[in-house]
């Protein structure tokens, strides 16, 4: 169906009457009135002002972005819609194609390029960041930054800051953020960096949320009442549940929350489904589904079960790759047919999408999901269960943040359907209620900058700005430096306080002792203490000092030491300060003054580090590039320009490999296998398959060894210049990549024999590898002899189930 909106002249901006018509036409698209915060944000957009909207999950932030799209199309201009995740970009692309027509919408995600000249272009933040540096979009009017709170993400936050810094000042920004503590600070930084921006903060949820706690036995209570009185008992135990099941699925439960099979019947009986059940591991999600299918009843009546069969049949026709060949796929299909699903990043994209569709239609009542489902995927529920307050991280287990709880809990409560959403938090110890109450009483955490200078960022800055002061100005426009300036102001204020206290301490004068006299007394007393420590049995001597005493006695008589101690004591007693009643307070003031001076010096050093930290970081990164000859006289060589064009965390090692000859003479499938060593290492693989592959492929084993030498050199140079950037080198994907790129057709057999992990992980690894290969092919600085090799590598990978998953 053709998309129609009132036309607006882009030349001078829409007149007031047209603004009114445009807004009224937009209102007619929705069966409900706009909320006041949406109206406020829309009026800023109509006035051409940038806006940042902070509101809870499900409050309707996306509607503000949809108006920006509506207005952009009316003005016949272009809009870039950025998301932090490829899956979210794919979802937005599909949504916008349905709303506005595929002719108006395009997508750029690195491995996928569809309709790149469209007026509405969905893309990841990395893509738009690079476009701003190298090839700005023509006629770009607006940039939407969806999930803007991702600016605080450890791995991806830098890109968000770079995008805002490099965005042309003539482009309107529409930023959408979850509720965070420092939205005003973020808005102030954007205002200083890009231009005036108006913050619209709406903390109220459209559907009220009740947070409850569930103990290890399945008793649900209010946050205030949990653990303080007898909680409400569960209304029924799942059929077949026995004490031996407790032992099998959780031991004595000292550190385990209630098992899902115990809680789900309670949720069903209370009418709190559909439910998103968050479990912080893939294996935990799969075990929960498997155990429920063993013991729990179906959650579907016959009519709903028939609808599920119809949707599954349709999905199998569209995506034949999701047939239940693997053990996980078979488990998922069994669950869907009984109204229970699972959702995590290791699943096939098409199978995840099928689960989402069934959940949205109310045909799946419970989905066991990892927390990735809380990041923008549209799956509103009646209730949310968070299984425990602790999750595993790289450094061990840690407590959830308030932002994480808010993000997950925010999925509960469907607008226009539920009067109230329910967020049930599982307690994993009998004493967990107090910990939960303390955590839930905290405000949302502030967004902290994760800005860092990588090799690609440094190369792009050198390509774009020739003048070092300009580069420094751009770097110090970062949110990280903005927050550093706040810390510097705090340090300056603290130094001022310390200086005042130090002056007061220095100003104290003893009525009888002058400072030089007191200092001579203290010096003599210190000498006396050292001599006393040499005497046997001195209580103040340490173990090391006592060992030193024993050695000294063999060289010097004990009598000599005692004689010196006696003489020093007598001399000290004759000094005027020895019996002075004012000496103690004077010494205390003097000691306090010295400590204050040391503290001020520490604050001064910290301030200096904050003032130049990012610029120093940039200089060190450029020094590494210069060491390898990728920067000469302040200009990039072809190798450096190639690095600048890569959206990849391993960009330096990739460039070293490309220009070292590591890929010379290889076929496309072999080049793909070797390039896979430079991508992110997968979570779980069949290590034996990789070893067997390398034993059989001696020439690739030698190429890998050459990469290991290059990696060792990079590590040594980074250590020398104090550049703590990580890089990756592994062989885990080589066997699967080589076989698939060479034309292997048996996907299930490939996953089982050459990979050993989750199918979804392998799909994602191949999509990333395709993206990296295309970046190399598109680079004008790639050696021409390698271009056809990487073209063949990409073509061999981008087919079958891997291609089918590109836009899911």
Predicted feature residues:
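SF2 helicase catalytic motif II
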Residues: 125-127, 134-174
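Conserved C-terminal RecA-like helicase domain
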Residues: 82, 97-106, 278, 282-366, ...
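Non-catalytic terminal extensions of ATP-dependent helicases
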Residues: 337, 341, 360-364, 445, ...
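Helicase-associated low-complexity/disordered flanking segments
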Residues: 1-51, 208, 300-337, 597
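Walker A/P-loop NTP-binding motif
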Residues: 43-51, 61-77, 161-166
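Conserved nucleic-acid-binding Ia/Ib motif block in the N-terminal RecA-like helicase ATPase lobe
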Residues: 76-130, 188
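Conserved segment of the helicase C-terminal RecA-like domain
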Residues: 379, 383-393, 398-440
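Conserved interdomain linker/interface between the two RecA-like ATPase lobes of SF2 helicase motors
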Residues: 165, 172-174, 179-291, 341
